[in-house]
């Protein structure tokens, strides 16, 4: 072994120390001390695998394994910091129960719905899958097959899945788990601005004078961003932090003003603030007159339940997202009932506190950053709440300038970059296009080299609807990738599990671990994780980041995109397209979906020589497939306000915020001088709308679908904790994180506990008409609910708390409300 001078000195020092201790140090031990090619750790960059913050980490690999990670000091997002989960990223891929081979339910050597999971080859797995898909497509058509994806998919994985489903199988029945976390944010952006994703960026943290958290525990869910708020608050005494929530949590520890409100009453609070702005002559008339229109939303729209549900039948305008033009005077009249007294009565927040909050929005000299996560999004009126907060910023002109920013925080690493931008929702296409728009379908068909009429015009089944259709036998072949919906989704017992175990259905789950969802499937496919593949994520501030594959995958695992693309080889075009479509493209006869979708002269145009040596997918397919998928996808957004840089550029930087025009990223959208798409002389240009004007939309307070009653007398709120991410598939396999928080607890007010004869640590039964769970009571600790409400996190697979949640959704976004349902609690004898 060749040794450097530094290594020689270190080795001699070690030998001297050993001699003093009376120890003889063998020559073979020197490589424990000396640096060499064999012992060196190789470092490369990658975005974190967890939340939507988009921290960059340095990944240390040695002997084909990830052995260490650290915060990337060159990253503008996290500036070298990680949260506790990020510091243990090196361990997420090496759980003892990592799946390494396909598993098929079999009995007597054949597939059987009630059989035992048995290892099979990939060929066998795909043979069975293809047989089921072809039979379903032949007998029941494209609407009988579906896919449930993820905001954790890489950009390329989501894009490949969209192409296979919407162009190949001609089914729009593809939806991401981002439906459960970001759908209301999407619809809110589209209604108000005509284009998706935040206009601000993380630079706003260093400019704002007031932060308002509307249902977001950033201290635990976005801790790295919370450090930036903390630094701003502690470094600038005039800065104020406001936290609104239905229970006390760690973000309140920094708050200057905390507001505990009754569930659903945030609607009343936001309307009061708008009324306060008007009554106190704080409207920025120059901005409002030049850049906004006033609209009235249709009300009494139901709760996204099944059509035969009594609440849905009762709604006068079920599922309607219609709006009508109104004048400012009509808007003023619509918010006038929301006096401080009325808002206090509805919300439980004192009048003086409400006025304190309203003054910060009304003060023209106070830059306000509004932030929200699941507290606002997982809400049966989540879209309305988005609009109501945008109203406050539009009325005052506090938008799209440094420190003035309504900002939706994402929970998954690529809920923006993949679910939203790629368009993996049942109604969307890339770059904010939708399947219902014939012009948009024509654009997609042109980019994809498909005959006119390939993409269906009717939106597919959204996430909650997919569960219902599986249960009803309408949806029969279903592929779940990169999510654990059997644990994460609502109403498990009544709507989801029956569909998975319906004997008419064939369920495939692609995952790295045997999750609750995988255990309910018929076929489980082992999946590559994080830096076992090359990929790209898009974070909450529109920052696209890419990474190289850095280690080989475990066992026979493959990336989600490899699985999708390889599966496409099993289908001839004649198997899936009708004759009238084939007649428009006779050149495709006899070709596979792989030939048409992925070997199309675009995806395969970048040679293998451009890829790194360690790139399993590229070597398998024979070309630089990640670059090909990315560049074809990027064609949708370039020149249309979603411009991405060339793929190779992203490997050289710590991400870029789109639109990227002439090599320059965009920090603040819609603002002249910052956004290249804002017209000269406009000041602000909300170009997502045809006339460049944003909408101020009036929406009232409406009660939730269920309220506590004599039998079910407590509110239940579900959510997350710092140490675990979502359902804990990764974090619960990290020993340090598991030991820190091994179990989900029921956080409860001590007086509610005493009234039921309960003490801290007692095991209780939480129940309602949909199910029951056993959990231990916690009357202290980080989360402190008010009387009448309990909080239980959903990371614990042994406590499937979401079985208690009603599958009510926002009728406009189809996003489930996980934050409020009635339950009762009894002590386990």
Curated annotation (Swiss-Prot):
Where do the annotations place substrate binding?
794
What is this protein's name? Answer: Periplasmic nitrate reductase
Q: What's the Enzyme Commission number for this chain? A: 1.9.6.1
Q: Which residues bind Mo-bis(molybdopterin guanine dinucleotide)?
A: 85, 152, 177, 181, 214-221, 245-249, 264-266, 374, 378, 484, 510-511, 533, 560, 718-727, 802, 819
| Catalytically driven reaction(s) | 2 Fe(II)-[cytochrome] + nitrate + 2 H(+) = 2 Fe(III)-[cytochrome] + nitrite + H2O
Provide GO CC annotations from the record: membrane; nitrate reductase complex; periplasmic space
> What organism is this sequence from?
Vibrio cholerae serotype O1 (strain ATCC 39315 / El Tor Inaba N16961)
Under the GO molecular function aspect, what terms does this record hold?
A: 4 iron, 4 sulfur cluster binding; electron transfer activity; iron ion binding; molybdenum ion binding; molybdopterin cofactor binding; nitrate reductase (cytochrome) activity; nitrate reductase activity
Post-translational modification here is noted as: Predicted to be exported by the Tat system. The position of the signal peptide cleavage has not been experimentally proven.
* Annotated CDD domains: MopB_CT_Nitrate-R-NapA-like, MopB_Nitrate-R-NapA-like
Which residues does the record give as [4Fe-4S] cluster binding sites? 48, 51, 55, 83
């Amino acid at each position: 072994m060749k040794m450097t001078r530094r290594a020689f000195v270190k080795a001699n020092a070690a030998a001297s120390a050993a001699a003093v201790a009376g120890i003889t140090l063998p020559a073979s031990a020197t490589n424990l001390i000396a640096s060499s090619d064999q012992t060196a750790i190789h470092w490369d960059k990658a975005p974190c695998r967890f939340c939507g913050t988009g921290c960059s980490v340095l990944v240390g690999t040695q002997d084909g394994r990830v052995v260490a990670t650290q915060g990337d000091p060159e990253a503008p997002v996290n500036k070298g910091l990680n949260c506790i989960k990020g510091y243990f990223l090196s361990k997420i891929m090496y759980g003892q129960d990592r799946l390494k081979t396909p598993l098929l339910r079999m009995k007597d050597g054949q597939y059987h719905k009630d059989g035992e999971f048995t290892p099979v080859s990939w060929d066998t797995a795909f043979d069975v899958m293809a047989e089921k898909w072809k039979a379903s497509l032949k007998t029941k058509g494209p609407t009988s097959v579906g896919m449930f994806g993820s905001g954790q998919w890489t950009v390329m994985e989501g894009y490949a899945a969209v192409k296979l489903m919407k162009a190949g199988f001609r089914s729009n029945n593809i939806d991401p788990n981002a439906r459960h976390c970001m759908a209301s944010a999407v619809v809110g952006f589209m209604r108000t601005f005509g284009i998706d994703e935040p206009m601000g960026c993380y630079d706003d943290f260093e400019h704002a004078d007031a932060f308002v958290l509307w249902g977001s525990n950033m201290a635990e869910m976005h801790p790295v961003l919370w450090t930036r708020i903390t630094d701003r608050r502690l470094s600038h005494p005039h800065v104020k932090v406001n936290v609104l929530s239905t229970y006390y949590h760690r973000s309140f520890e920094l708050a200057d003003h905390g507001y505990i409100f009754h569930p659903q009453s945030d609607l009343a609070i936001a309307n009061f603030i708008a009324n306060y702005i008007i009554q106190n002559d704080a409207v920025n008339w120059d901005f409002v007159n030049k850049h906004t229109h006033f609209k009235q939303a249709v009300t009494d729209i139901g709760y996204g339940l099944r059509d035969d549900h009594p609440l849905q039948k009762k709604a006068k305008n079920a599922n309607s997202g219609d709006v009508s033009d109104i004048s400012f005077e009509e808007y003023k009249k619509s918010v006038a009932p929301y006096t401080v007294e009325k808002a206090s009565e509805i919300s439980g927040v004192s009048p003086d506190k409400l006025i304190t909050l309203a003054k910060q929005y009304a003060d023209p000299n106070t830059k306000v950053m509004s932030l929200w996560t699941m507290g606002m999004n997982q809400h049966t009126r989540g879209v309305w709440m988005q609009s109501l907060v945008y109203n406050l910023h539009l009325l005052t002109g506090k938008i799209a300038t440094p420190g003035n920013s309504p900002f939706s925080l994402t929970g998954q690493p690529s809920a923006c970059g993949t679910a939203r931008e790629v368009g993996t929702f049942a109604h969307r296409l890339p770059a904010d296009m939708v399947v219902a728009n014939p012009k948009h379908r024509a654009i997609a068909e042109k980019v994809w080299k498909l005959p006119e009429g390939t993409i269906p015009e009717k939106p597919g089944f959204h996430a909650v609807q997919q569960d219902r259709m599986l249960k009803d036998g309408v949806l029969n072949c279903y592929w779940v990738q990169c999510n654990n919906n059997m644990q994460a989704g609502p109403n498990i017992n009544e709507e989801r599990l029956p569909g998975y175990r319906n004997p008419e259905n064939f369920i495939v789950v692609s995952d790295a671990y045997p999750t609750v969802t995988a255990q309910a499937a018929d076929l489980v496919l082992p999946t590559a994780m994080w830096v076992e593949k090359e990929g790209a994520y898009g974070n909450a501030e529109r920052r696209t980041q890419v990474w190289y594959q850095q280690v080989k995958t475990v066992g026979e695992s493959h990336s989600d995109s490899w699985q999708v693309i390889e599966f496409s080889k099993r289908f001839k075009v004649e198997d899936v397209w009708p004759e009238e479509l084939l007649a428009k493209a006779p050149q495709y006869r006899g070709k596979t979906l792989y030939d048409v979708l992925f070997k199309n002269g675009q995806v395969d145009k970048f040679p293998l020589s451009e890829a790194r040596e360690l790139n399993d997918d590229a070597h398998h397919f024979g070309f630089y497939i990640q670059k090909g998928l990315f560049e074809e996808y990027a064609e949708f957004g370039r020149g249309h306000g979603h411009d991405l840089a060339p793929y190779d550029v992203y490997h050289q930087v710590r991400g870029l915020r789109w639109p990227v025009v002439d090599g320059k990223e965009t920090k603040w959208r819609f603002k002249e001088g910052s956004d290249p798409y804002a017209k000269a002389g406009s000041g602000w240009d909300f170009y997502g709308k045809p006339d460049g004007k944003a909408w101020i939309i009036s929406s009232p307070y409406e009660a939730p679908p269920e309220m506590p009653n004599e039998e079910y007398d407590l509110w239940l709120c579900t959510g997350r904790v710092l140490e675990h991410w979502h359902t804990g598939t990764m974090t619960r396999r990290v020993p340090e994180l598991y030991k820190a928080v091994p179990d989900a607890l029921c956080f409860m007010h001590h007086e509610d506990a005493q009234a039921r004869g309960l003490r801290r640590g007692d095991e209780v039964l939480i129940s309602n008409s949909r199910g029951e769970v056993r959990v231990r009571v916690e009357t202290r600790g980080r989360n402190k609910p008010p009387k009448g409400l309990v909080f239980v996190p959903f990371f614990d697979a042994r406590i499937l708390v979401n079985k208690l949640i009603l599958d009510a959704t926002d009728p406009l976004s189809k996003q489930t409300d996980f934050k409020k349902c009635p339950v009762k609690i009894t002590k386990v004898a």
